């Protein structure tokens, strides 16, 4: 069911719980093909790329069931979410094509917003929003796609700005939620994985623009943080 009270934004009510990855659960990076420019800085794999793809396909299926037949507007939070977003909408389009059910509306309309609240691995506490006029989302079903829910600050602040224009509903899709004491308790509605509080790279996650091209989600080494910290 697509309808959801705006005041429930960020509470995760009625969601299917994410795949829980226990603390200290890793794969040895030597068991994977790691590009030479990444190898010195990655020694632990948290989420293999194949697992990520399969999990995103399941999220797309859940989203399809929720919004089928409705006009869905999906907002990609740039640029960290681009990889997750592209994979998600590819699966959404494929699922609708072969679902066997006819719909008079496209599976989604895509939009892009640039938000920035991090430098190095720390939230600055200040949110910068670069986007078109948010009023286009008035009376629309909106799904915000973010790569990770960490402190929750970014999506809380952006959510407040979006609420002001009066969307019909607002939900969050994210690949990863961190279990961290720094969280403001914001929860996503469609969540791939629940992980411990470690800094991750790969599969579109970066550290100051490095490692986005790595195919797996890995834990960033101390050596990488020292070398690439700005």
Swiss-Prot record:
Reactions performed catalytically: IMP + diphosphate = hypoxanthine + 5-phospho-alpha-D-ribose 1-diphosphate; GMP + diphosphate = guanine + 5-phospho-alpha-D-ribose 1-diphosphate; XMP + diphosphate = xanthine + 5-phospho-alpha-D-ribose 1-diphosphate
Active site residues of this protein: 150
Chain residues that bind Mg(2+): 206
Gene Ontology terms: biological process: GMP salvage; guanine salvage; hypoxanthine metabolic process; IMP salvage; purine ribonucleoside salvage; XMP salvage
GO cellular component: a single term: cytosol
Binding site residues for GMP: 79, 146-154, 178, 199-200, 206
CDD domains linked: PRTases_typeI
Function: Catalyzes the transfer of a ribosyl phosphate group from 5-phosphoribose 1-diphosphate to the N(9) of hypoxanthine, guanine or xanthine, leading to IMP, GMP and XMP, respectively. Plays a central role in the generation of purine nucleotides through the purine salvage pathway.
Subunit structure: Homodimer at low ionic strength and homotetramer at high ionic strength.
Assigned protein family: Belongs to the purine/pyrimidine phosphoribosyltransferase family.
Official protein name in the record: Hypoxanthine-guanine-xanthine phosphoribosyltransferase
Organism lineage string: Eukaryota, Sar, Alveolata, Apicomplexa, Conoidasida
């Amino acid at each position: 069911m697509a309808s959801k009270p705006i005041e429930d934004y960020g509470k995760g009510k009625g969601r299917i719980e994410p795949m829980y990855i226990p603390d200290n659960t890793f794969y040895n990076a030597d068991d994977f093909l790691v590009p030479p420019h990444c190898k010195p800085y990655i020694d632990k794999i948290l989420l293999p790329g194949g697992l990520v793809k399969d999990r995103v396909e399941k999220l797309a299926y859940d989203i399809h069931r929720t919004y089928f037949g409705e006009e869905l507007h999906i907002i990609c939070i740039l640029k960290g979410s681009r990889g997750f977003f592209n994979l998600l909408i590819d699966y959404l389009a494929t699922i609708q094509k072969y679902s066997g059910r006819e719909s008079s509306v496209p599976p989604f309309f895509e939009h892009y917003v640039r938000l920035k609240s991090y430098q190095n691995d720390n939230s600055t506490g200040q949110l910068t929003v670069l986007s078109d006029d948010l009023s286009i989302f008035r009376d629309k079903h909106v799904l915000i796609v973010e790569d990770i829910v960490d402190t929750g600050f970014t999506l809380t602040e952006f959510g407040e700005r979006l609420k002001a224009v009066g969307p019909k509903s607002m939900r969050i899709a994210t690949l990863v939620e961190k279990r961290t004491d720094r969280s403001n308790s914001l929860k996503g509605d469609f969540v791939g994985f629940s992980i411990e509080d470690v800094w991750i790279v790969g599969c579109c996650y970066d550290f100051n623009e490095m490692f986005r091209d790595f195919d797996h989600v890995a834990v960033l080494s101390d050596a990488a943080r020292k070398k690439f910290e700005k």
